[in-house]
Amino acid sequence: MPQDRSSPPNPRLPLPVQPTQLPLWHERVRGLPNPIARSSLFTVGNQNEPRSFYREHRTIQTLAGWVLTVRGEELRQDDEDVFLQLIHLARCQPLGEAVSFTAYSFLKELGWKRSVEGYNRLKASFDRLQFTSIRLSSDTTSGDGFYLYQGALVRKFMGKSADSDEPKSKWTVWLEPEIIKLFGPSAYTQVWWEQRLRLRSALAKYLHSYFSTHEAPYPLKVETLKGLTGSRAARLTDFRKALRVALQQLVAEGFLDAWTIDGADIVHVTRSTRGKAAKVLPAG
């Protein structure tokens, strides 16, 4: 039998140190993993329509290079707002430690109503983030059972009921420490928070996150964008109409300089200098 001639690990060599804390980006931006921003995990579904529910892991649309499956209740752009703010608060301490805040302050940061309706909406979003499970892998390792991340976006949530007489009581959330894998040096994007909050259209918010992941966005077919956004528009014509309105909103906000949809139904956009400012903000 041939002998194993490989060298055993040297116990004196230090093991690679794994980061335990998220990057300390600037207060005016929010961090979002690129594979999530370039997928239909957070859809543009209408808040007046029932959310889909997937009992088994279902592969959702992403750009080439990644495979993302989801099980649980459909996540939408309001859930992305909550996730962005939660991750922002969590960056100040090691992952896995409790993240505490008042529901009042959280709602205020989101621009949501500080009312029973707002508290219930926030709690429902945390519930979805806790009970919806994702699996993310590269398209070269998806068949090997290796996942860059596997689990819920929120490990645990504790908060008082919306009708509590203590509106400024503490709510507490725990994140999975493994979520750090989604925030490597070139694996996440800084989203300009004030711009995002001013956008009232779910489609405009999605496009804002998506195009933030590219300094010079690649042209993309309207049909591809429809799939990535998770739009339920019955006809591509209807989606294209909404897309034009959303793109113009991004121009009005100073995020885009220009956009066109050419004769081949391909979307071309030009990021503005102001839109790229979030990329160069120092931490603090």
Predicted regions and their residues:
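Charged, alpha-helix-forming regions
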Residues: 1-284
